[in-house]
């Protein structure tokens, strides 16, 4: 079912991609080679906006799948549009040369070192100077190319914030080195590991790495693991990329009931901080300030009431005045804040302001009027 869905998405969107996709030969000084690369630029690209950059190895196999999912999620799920580059590696089995590692050390072989520099010092800088890219940069690879992405984690600052690693053919000791590095790196990282149903030594190493990654309890490390027992080396790509793409941009989705129960209600921090951190992270990673969802406002309001965290109502009220001007939202929440503090006069004046403004969501003028009448009765105004 999932596979058919994403195949449909691929067909739907790839039919109209011609004008947005270009293929060219990239002259690499580092490799001393001419490499085939393919670019996807959103059709409504604007130099005034910032776009996450996605680097896709095994471009012949993965590029179209990644583009289709990017278009689908940006159109229907509100995730940001992305700039995508695919590096072709099929001819002459270049992928095995580009991503080769030494069997004894597990580190890149000579050609691998040059390919590492080609991506990091030539291809990516070219795209970042040509287009207005966001700080958020993603790596997508499969098998040997998936393993190669891990090497960027060992730089002082990783070139990539996000990794979609599909059935990686892990170099020696990588199942231990990657978790150890992710546990110590001072950087927000999104890591999605995917494995199919193949039974081999690689699978055992992947499952060992998964166990170690799941044990990391650290702010800023976002890890997901998906296993598809019936998938083979071909279908795993179709199964895996769609779900992984959604998880990479999960912060763009409205706060879900599960998130509300498991993350917000259980947190010992002020409720408003959760909302503030969410939107600050989006701005830091993606380079723009996302409009606050009304759903998220209501989730934080409900949690503030449930946890008797009335201090969170004050900053929430100020945010609502900015995001939803002209509506009751900000002044109504502020009125409840003063009401909780026992400041009757301030609360009454604030509810009067709310009464004069437009209704929104569950808030009605009748509710503001009831608050005003109750305050007058309680405080004898």
Residue ranges and their predicted role:
Residues 1-22, 191:
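Bacterial Sec-dependent N-terminal signal peptides
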Residues 20-344, 348-381:
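Non-catalytic cap/lid and distal C-terminal segments of serine-dependent acyl enzymes
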């Amino acid at each position: 079912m999932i596979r058919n869905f994403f195949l449909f998405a691929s067909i739907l969107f790839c039919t109209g991609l011609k004008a947005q996709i270009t293929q060219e030969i990239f002259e690499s000084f580092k490799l001393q080679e001419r490499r085939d690369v393919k670019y996807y630029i959103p059709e409504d690209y604007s130099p005034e906006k910032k776009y996450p950059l996605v680097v896709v190895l095994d471009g012949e196999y993965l590029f179209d799948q990644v583009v289709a999912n990017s278009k689908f999620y940006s159109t229907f799920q509100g995730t940001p549009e992305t700039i995508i580059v695919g590096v072709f590696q099929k001819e002459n089995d270049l992928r095995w040369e580009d991503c080769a590692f030494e069997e004894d050390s597990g580190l890149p072989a000579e050609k691998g070192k040059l390919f590492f520099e080609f991506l990091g010092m030539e291809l990516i800088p070219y795209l970042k100077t040509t287009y207005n890219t966001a700080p958020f940069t993603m790596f997508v690879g499969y098998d040997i190319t998936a393993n190669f992405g891990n090497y960027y984690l060992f730089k002082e600052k990783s070139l990539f914030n996000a990794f979609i690693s599909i059935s990686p053919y892990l170099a020696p000791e990588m199942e231990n080195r990657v978790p150890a590095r992710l546990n110590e790196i001072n950087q927000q990282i999104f890591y999605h590991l995917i494995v199919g149903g193949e039974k081999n030594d690689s699978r055992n190493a992947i499952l060992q790495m998964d166990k170690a990654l799941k044990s990391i309890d650290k702010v800023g490390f976002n890890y997901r693991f998906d296993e598809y027992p019936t998938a083979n080396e071909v279908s795993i790509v179709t199964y895996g990329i769609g779900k992984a793409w959604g998880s990479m941009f999960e912060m763009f989705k409205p706060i879900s009931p599960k998130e509300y129960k498991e993350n917000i209600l259980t947190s010992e921090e002020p409720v408003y901080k959760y909302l503030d951190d969410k939107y600050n992270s989006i701005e830091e990673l993606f380079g723009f300030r996302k409009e606050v969802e009304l759903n998220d406002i209501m989730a934080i309001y409900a949690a503030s009431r449930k946890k008797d965290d009335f201090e969170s109502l004050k900053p929430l009220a100020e945010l609502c005045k900015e995001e939803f001007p002209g509506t009751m939202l900000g002044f109504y929440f502020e009125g409840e804040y003063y009401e909780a503090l026992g400041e009757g006069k301030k609360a009454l004046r604030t509810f009067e302001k709310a009464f004069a403004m437009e209704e929104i969501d569950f808030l009605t003028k009748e509710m503001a009027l009831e608050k005003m009448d109750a305050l007058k009765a309680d405080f004898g105004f």
